C-alpha cells in the first residue's frame, strides 16, 4: 500500500502529525517559541526578561525571539530541527506583561526545559540565557530580571562549603553583624605598612580586614609579602584580644595556576579565608569554590565589575540573578549593597538580594524584585557583605535594613578616624554593641538610633569623634534600579 502524500501548503509541511515549516524566514511565534497556554513544569528553568522592542516590533514577537535565540533558533528555518525533539528543546515564551509606568517595556516570561543545560555549570547556563540574544537587533534593550531555578537543577551544584552557620561557629561569634574594614589606601602601601593597618584594625575590635578588589601583586607590594605581613598581624591581634580574627587575602590573578598557588600559600600560613573577584569569570569562581571546599576555607567574593551590567535598568542582568548564580557557584561571602552607603542600592531591591542569599526558601515578593518562589533545597546560605561609604553614625539604619547575618565593612569609616585606625575600629565596635543591646532590650532602635549612639559616645571618646566627623554624611541619590512589578490584576497578552 502506498504511503499517502502529506498535505503541503504554502506555509507548512505536515510530517507524522507534526508541523514543519518550509525553508525561509518565519516569525518566531510561528516557529513554536510563543505558547500562551503553556504551563511551566516543575523542572523548567524560568527566566523573566525586561524587553524593550525596537519601534514597530510586536512585544509578543520580541518575547518569542528572545526565547528562540536563547535556546534552539537561528535566523532561518533549518531542516535539522527534525533530527531533534525540537518541541522539547525550544524555549517557550508564555506570558508578556507591560511594565508599569514604563512605556515600550515589557516583562516576558520564558520557560526552558532542564535538558538544555549541563548540570552544575554556571558557564553553560549563562551561555544560553545571556548569550548572543543580548545583541539581537530587534531589541533596543534586554535585561534579565529574575530566574526560577528548579530543585532538580539546584541540586547539581555544591553551593557554599561553609555558609553562615558554620562560619559563626568557627568564629564563635553570634547574635550580631560581623565587623570588617577594607585596607586603605587600596593601592600603594608596602607589605609591612599594609600589615600594620590590619593589626591596628583587628586589635581595635574588628572581626575581619580585607584586601580591595584591585590589590593583587603589583610592583609596590608582591602578593607573598602581603600575605606574610597580614597573617602575622592576624596572629598578633588574636593573641592580644582572645578573639578569632581573619583577613581576606585576595588570590585573584591572571591564571588559575597562579590563583591556586596563592590560595595554597594562604592555607599554609593558617588563613581561614581567601578572596576572589567576580571579574575572574564563572568557571574560575566555581573552580576556586571547589578548591576552598577541599581545603576547608571560607571563600569571599568581591563583586568587582558587576555594575557594568547590573546597574542599567533596561539592559543587562539584575544583581538578584547574580546572587542566585553565586549561591549555586559556592561562594561563602558576597558584597550585596548597603542601602545607606555610597554605592547604588534601592532599599527594597537590596533587601531582595539579601533574601536570596540568606533564606532557605524565597517567596515571591514583587516589592523586593523577587518574581518567583525559589526553593534552595538545603543549599547553604551566603553571608552578605555591606561596604562602601558606611560609618558608625548609620549603625541603627544598617541593623534595621540588613539584619544581623551580614558583614559590615567600614573601610574609610575605620581607617579615616581622626585618632587612628584602632580608634576607628573601637568606635564601630562600641556603636554596634550599643545598638544590639538596645535591640535585645526591645527598644525601637531605628527611631532612637541617634540617641543610643550619643549615649554610648559619652563613655567612648573614639565613637564621639566618629559621630562628630561623619554624623551628617549621607549619600542621598535616587536609585537607578527600583523594583518595578506587575500587579496580579494586570491583564497579560
UniProtKB/Swiss-Prot annotation:
- UniProt lineage: Bacteria, Pseudomonadati, Pseudomonadota, Alphaproteobacteria, Acetobacterales
Give the top-level enzyme category: lyase
Which residues of the sequence carry a binding annotation for substrate? 132, 182, 186, 303, 335, 387
Q: What is its EC number?
A: 4.1.1.39
MF (Gene Ontology)? magnesium ion binding; monooxygenase activity; ribulose-bisphosphate carboxylase activity
SUPFAM superfamilies the record matches: RuBisCo, C-terminal domain (SSF51649), RuBisCO, large subunit, small (N-terminal) domain (SSF54966)
Q: Which reaction does it catalyse?
A: 2 (2R)-3-phosphoglycerate + 2 H(+) = D-ribulose 1,5-bisphosphate + CO2 + H2O; D-ribulose 1,5-bisphosphate + O2 = 2-phosphoglycolate + (2R)-3-phosphoglycerate + 2 H(+)
Species of provenance: Acidiphilium cryptum (strain JF-5)
HAMAP family per UniProt: RuBisCO_L_type1 (MF_01338)
Per the Swiss-Prot or TrEMBL record, the active site comprises 184 (proton acceptor), 302 (proton acceptor)
The lineage's top-level taxon is Bacteria
Q: In its UniProt entry, what is this protein called? A: Ribulose bisphosphate carboxylase large chain
- Positions carrying N6-carboxylysine are 210
- What cofactor does this chain's UniProt record say it requires? Mg(2+)
Tell me what else is known. Answer: The basic functional RuBisCO is composed of a large chain homodimer in a 'head-to-tail' conformation. In form I RuBisCO this homodimer is arranged in a barrel-like tetramer with the small subunits forming a tetrameric 'cap' on each end of the 'barrel'.
Functional summary from the UniProt entry? RuBisCO catalyzes two reactions: the carboxylation of D-ribulose 1,5-bisphosphate, the primary event in carbon dioxide fixation, as well as the oxidative fragmentation of the pentose substrate. Both reactions occur simultaneously and in competition at the same active site.
- Which Gene Ontology biological process is one annotated for this entry? reductive pentose-phosphate cycle
Site Transition state stabilizer: which residues? 342
Q: Tell me which UniProt keywords the record has, alphabetically.
A: Calvin cycle, Carbon dioxide fixation, Lyase, Magnesium, Metal-binding, Monooxygenase, Oxidoreductase
Cofactor: how and how many bound: Binds 1 Mg(2+) ion per subunit.
InterPro entries named in the record: RuBisCO (IPR033966), RuBisCo_large_chain_AS (IPR020878), RuBisCO_lsu_C (IPR000685), RuBisCO_lsu_C_sf (IPR036376), RuBisCO_lsu_fd_N (IPR017443), RuBisCO_lsu_N_sf (IPR036422), RuBisCO_lsuI (IPR020888)
Q: Which Pfam families match?
A: RuBisCO_large, RuBisCO_large_N
Gene encoding this chain? cbbL
Fill in the subunit field for this protein.
Heterohexadecamer of 8 large chains and 8 small chains.
PROSITE patterns (alphabetical):
RUBISCO_LARGE
User: Family, per the entry?
Assistant: Belongs to the RuBisCO large chain family. Type I subfamily.
